[in-house]
């Protein structure tokens, strides 16, 4: 973790530093001249560096006997949380590339900062998130000679006003949770099994208990899940020799905020490897399926962070963890599975397995926890990526106030969400001749019919479904993400839990 400081006075220069100065398009060239001299101003103009987002201009200078790297970075303004976090992220990345041990981020001349308004805590959080995630790398399986020792140790932000330490600490908690979710997603499937997820949850609980938090863990094995009638979840799991695990993390705050929902349930899809079953995926479609548990990674990581942030909700994270494989014992096309609420489901696609595991988790949440609201997160459908592209999550809900709170949290976090409808007429696609319903609809509207399927298992609880099939994973760097697991939507979950969730159901 970086040592992050804020100051309103210009920091002293030292060797091994990187100074980053954000500039907007249309900036006055004389600003550069006054700060760095006419030679730098002329070189910037010749480059040309205009100050557009994504542009940068770097040089080295000697001052007071110390060599200092300087990077001018273009920005459209820093009031937008995504832009502010991106600036910090890119600055930290460049510091790592240059081998700098200290980063100086000059926000003194930057306009549009939230800190210039009434939310310096948010500014501190966003900057800390960007700085920490700018140092993220998944190198666990690189040999020693191919690993790069991180150089960056500290960062100082110089601004017109200082953000409080609380904001910085909160941002570092959020960043650590995003990084943990990425690590879980990026781990190979032979390592990150259902048992591994359960053990990770146990380690988190042990650590949090040692810090004095009221947390608990329940892990149900196959036999215990059978006793609870989780036929859909166990049907998916039966093709693998790896035992399934149903994970229930619980946190109870010391004090409850007045007028807030008492219990919030976060449910994450936990398919640690998805071959598609007998509806077998092609190789290209299977390569990234170690990441089919990114929903589980998000709710496990967000749980730990929410406890450390001491949110005022009783938070429960649920994961029905399993592998979806092909074997002589795997579930088959035409099978009929019985969910724990008694609904029967005809299987017409074994690659639509995530909704089956979520269904039993939702029934468990409603019947065992009795929450005020529950939200599921799942890399559920390719159809959602086709509809919204790879960077936007699809949201479906039965509750307007909950959706309003969620989208506000997403806007604060800088993660992108878009609502999809739940039209009743499309439920016709889920009708079965031999069971209460089938697990997939027709070709069109696949993301929506998946949401409609899940809506049959809400048991009257306020509910929202977030399809993260696109933004949970990245094939190449974009924004603050690296290839692999992205950690989306951890930041939005934590923004939601840190705020006031409306208690009025629609």
Model-found features: residue ranges?
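Short amphipathic alpha-helical segment within the helicase RecA-like ATPase core
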Residues: 1-270
């Amino acid at each position: 973790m970086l040592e992050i400081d804020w100051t309103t006075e210009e920091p002293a220069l030292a060797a091994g530093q990187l100074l980053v100065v954000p500039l907007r398009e249309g900036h006055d060239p004389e600003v550069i001249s006054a700060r760095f001299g006419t030679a730098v101003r002329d070189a910037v103009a010749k480059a040309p560096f205009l100050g557009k987002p994504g542009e940068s201009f770097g040089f080295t200078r000697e001052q007071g006997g110390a060599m200092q790297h300087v990077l001018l970075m273009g920005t459209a303004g820093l009031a937008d949380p995504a832009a502010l976090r991106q600036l910090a992220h890119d600055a930290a990345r460049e510091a790592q590339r240059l081998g700098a041990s200290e980063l100086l981020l000059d926000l003194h001349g930057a306009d549009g900062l939230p800190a210039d308004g009434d939310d310096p805590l948010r500014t501190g959080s966003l900057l800390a998130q960007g700085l920490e995630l700018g140092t993220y790398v998944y190198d666990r399986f690189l040999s020693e000679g191919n690993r790069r020792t991180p150089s960056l140790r500290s960062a100082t932000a110089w601004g017109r006003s200082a953000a409080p330490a609380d904001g910085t600490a909160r941002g570092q908690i959020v960043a650590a949770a995003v990084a943990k979710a990425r690590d879980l997603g990026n781990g190979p499937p032979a390592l990150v099994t259902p048992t591994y997820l359960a053990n990770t949850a146990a380690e988190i609980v042990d650590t949090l208990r040692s810090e004095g938090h009221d947390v608990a863990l329940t892990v149900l094995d196959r036999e215990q899940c059978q006793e609870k009638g989780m036929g859909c979840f166990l049907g998916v799991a039966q093709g693998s020799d790896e035992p399934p695990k149903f994970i229930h993390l619980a946190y109870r705050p010391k004090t409850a905020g007045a007028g807030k929902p008492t219990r919030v349930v976060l449910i994450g899809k936990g398919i640690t490897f998805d071959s598609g079953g007998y509806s077998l995926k092609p190789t290209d479609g299977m390569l990234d399926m170690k990441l089919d548990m990114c929903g589980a990674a998000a709710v496990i990581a967000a749980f730990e962070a929410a406890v450390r942030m001491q949110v005022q909700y009783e938070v429960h994270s649920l994961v029905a963890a399993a592998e979806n494989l092909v074997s002589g014992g795997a579930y088959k096309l035409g099978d009929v599975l019985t969910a724990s609420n008694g609904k029967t489901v005809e299987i017409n696609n074994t690659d639509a397995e995530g909704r089956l595991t979520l269904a039993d988790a939702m029934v468990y949440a409603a019947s065992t926890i009795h929450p005020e609201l529950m939200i599921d997160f799942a890399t559920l459908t390719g159809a959602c990526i086709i509809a919204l592209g790879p960077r936007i999550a699809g949201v479906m809900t039965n509750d307007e106030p909950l959706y309003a709170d969620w989208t506000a949290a997403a806007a604060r976090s800088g993660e992108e969400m878009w609502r999809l409808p739940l039209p009743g007429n499309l439920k016709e696609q889920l009708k079965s001749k031999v069971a209460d319903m089938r697990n997939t609809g027709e070709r069109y509207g696949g993301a929506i019919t998946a949401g409609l399927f899940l809506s049959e298992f809400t048991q009257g609880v306020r509910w929202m479904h977030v399809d993260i099939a696109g933004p949970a994973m990245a094939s190449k760097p974009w924004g603050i993400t690296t290839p692999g697991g992205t950690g989306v939507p951890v930041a939005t979950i934590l923004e939601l839990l840190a705020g006031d969730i409306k208690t009025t159901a629609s």
